């Protein structure tokens, strides 16, 4: 039971009590109030300060910090995660146990979660609060929630020095005047879905200049660049602080961003970067709030070619109905630099972005929450995309998040399905594995020429689900020159047949059929095509008139 120290003497009770009875009774109430308050203070008075816990996870070393302040029987402060800071907005006590209500940012929204803890000697045992991911997304930054389900032991101490920005007081944040809505002129880029590599899925915020240069080398030497992957995108974690003029500087892990861009360009590649329209990024680094023009000019001067712009803390400042105007601010700023920079929105499919994404100058927009490296996450995201198809067109693409191919959470068969589905969807092909250490099988998936050709087809139509029979789904994408890409997906665990009648494609003759993964022409009947599909696998064919 959670203790409350608020005691009220009922006036009617006072009137009914004899005078000689009331005084001892009132004294007893006052004593109980004092004892309860002292009891709470005894349990909480020693936990003010900084508490640190560290553990190892599949994402790397994880450090969580609590900055706590106890006053008048309440705990206030901040929970600091690798994904950013979150304020403690309420607390409860029960003996040596306590609960902290944390206000978290999750995929562009705010939500409250509970961190439960107890005092154990000179330590605190706390099960930290993490944002609940969208269904199928897996967890913070693509990490399984189960990873964080147990308590951690916190000791008093100093956190590891970080480049993250200080916590923001959102109540005193300067207000920004949003512009009247208008159409930002198309930048002429991304005539086909962008292809590249992004640091987040594999490295999260643990990135350096050296890592990016090594990835650039790998993209150039492995065949990735020659297969069409041209954008090397530095995700969250590169930012330092702003100088006296307000110009955002990279942190010490990136001593010279212009030199890094020059190096990436020398490899025949283009460099991308990451920011947020909010005061802080998802990782707690400096965002572009109120500094859109200056940041755009800075990136252009560095030689940046791609911007991923993540909603994150913007949800604490604006409503979804204001999202279009917020993104338009950066669209205008990028356009004003005169440099061609791909503009990729990351707003998790919210606010009917398909209706207005192109008008703010965006070349792509996210349609979902974050993906994680699992069949459940990938399939729940990928197979939910059919309704987005009408919004895709040359220069403007639906983005169901980055590829997890090669990160180890799925089988080679499942990664082949993942890659095929993204190709059919006309989604950006942004790899996220460690390109320095790729198996031949993973390399074969990511560089499969005929599958990439489906993704990059110049007609620019996104695929849609044609039929579903049990575990087997048939997806079709219209291609240039009257051809079709047809994918037979088996979402079940055991082999199952997939079939297609040519009349469903308005074909009245026997067309030419090619298996794109097997790289062979295959026979077909005059009526249609039937194939057995192994569990969690796919058969992808090109149907030509």
Predicted regions and their residues:
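Bacterial N-terminal signal peptides
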Residues: 23-33
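Central antiparallel beta-sheet cores of small beta-barrel/beta-sandwich binding domains
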Residues: 38-148
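Structural recognition of the beta-strand scaffold that forms the well-ordered cores
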Residues: 193-199, 228-235, 270-275, 305-310, ...
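Aromatic-lined carbohydrate-binding/catalytic grooves of carbohydrate-active enzymes
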Residues: 201-203, 211-319
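Aromatic-lined carbohydrate-recognition surfaces of secreted/lumenal glycan-active proteins
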Residues: 269-286, 331, 335-352
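Glycan-recognition surfaces
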Residues: 294, 325, 339-434, 455
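Carbohydrate-binding surface patches
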Residues: 422-425, 430-432, 468-507, 536
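C-terminal beta-strand-rich structural cap/linker in extracellular carbohydrate-active enzymes
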Residues: 524-545
